[in-house]
Amino acid sequence: MERKAYQNLLKWKNKTNRKPLLVSGVRQCGKTYLIKEFGRLEFADVAYFNFDGEEGLQSVFDYNFDTDRIIDELGSVVRGKKITVDETLVILDEIQACPRAIQSLKYFCENIPKLHIIAAGSLLGVALKEKGISFPVGKVNRLEMFPMSFEEFVIADGGKKYIDGLNKLNLEREIPELYTMPLEKYYKNYLVIGGMPEVVQSWIDTHDYKEAEEVQDIILKDYADDFGKYTTPDTAIKIKMIWDSIPVQIARDNSKFIFSHVKQGARAKELEDALSWIVNSGIALKLDLVSTPEIPLSGMADSTYFKVYLSDVGLLRRKANINYRTILVGNDAFIHFKGALAENYIFIQLKCMGIMPYFWRTKADAEIDFITDYGGELIPIEVKSADNTRAKSLHLFCGRYKPKIAFKSSLKNVGDNIEGDSHIWSLPLYAFFRFKDYMKREFAW
């Protein structure tokens, strides 16, 4: 399956000032497969090592940080084949299980800069925090992976012609039915299936929703098992409680995350470490409030007032026990969660683009689902789950802060209008992957 992260790997390989690459991302989002495939296609030799269960591997790093010795022992002893600097890609998988291997990346950067070495881990954020691991600041390149984006999903499911065709259309042009009908269907399927590669592969192989759900159930169980595997029993219980509360909290009108809704009477102090664990693991995504939208938004964010989404919209749908037919056919009673799924979908697409969003809210409850300062510009994004695009909050925001460009994303077709100083675009949910194209057009980047 085609992943855009592959291009990032190629760019890393060809950099003149290349450093060891540290690939992070939620468990089962496709890191190991992609890195191995990259090695198979781009290198004469691949030396793969996995710290999760490969006996004796950690001891190679326990003695000292002599990189020549480490490479010699990894090659000659562990795998029984010499590692050649100019030809071999060295992969250190599940590196979070070996703190000294993470530290060794600094010395590989300094002593053997020509060696192609990729380290990957699913719980890197958790390990770095809980084990007090000294991170090799400035000595590694970073790549964060996510589940498959909508664009990647469509291409994997045989819809490349629709993606390619849409990319050729003028941005101002209303999208013809030739594209809208199949892409709306792909969008609904993406809400059901999500972007976890194993689930997507099951869907591609069978086009059976129940088969895909069986894979989703296994992943959800694996996540829950990780809570107890990598934390104390007390913390695992708290993480599980937060994990179970996320779909409930997302579905509320005011989807601000409230700790007392996790456990009656609970305070933030009691549960914030458990929340940090689930966010650092990549399983959940945290969206902070910005009340005063000034650039940089990161400096204006209130990390104590936030929403929590999941890193995969298909897993959210499955965990919330929403029948796939409800997504595909619709239901008059399916209202609040339908909007929550659309928001979670846009959040994931923005993250896949490398964009960090926030949300905006006033004391009078006017709210913008997402705002970002991508490219140094303030950009509000309002999300609607159907084709009703009335957006009072967006008009209020544009009138008050005068962003040069703003977006309404729904099932309504492409359209635009000028409101004061703001150019407001209607961008269909299934065409949101063109978000950056509209930015480039607006600002002539």
Could you tell me what each predicted segment is?
Residues 1-16:
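Pre-Walker A adenine-sensing motif
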Residues 31:
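Conserved lysine of the Walker
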Residues 34, 38:
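Hydrophobic positions on the alpha1 helix immediately C-terminal to the Walker A/P-loop
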Residues 53-86:
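Short glycine-rich substrate-engagement loop in P-loop NTPases that contacts/grips substrate
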Residues 91, 116-122, 144:
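Structural recognition of the conserved hydrophobic beta-strand(s) that form the central parallel beta-sheet
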Residues 128-251:
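Interdomain motor-coupling "hinge/lid" segment immediately C-terminal to the ATP-binding subdomain
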Residues 201-372:
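Accessory nucleic acid-recognition modules appended to NTPase machines
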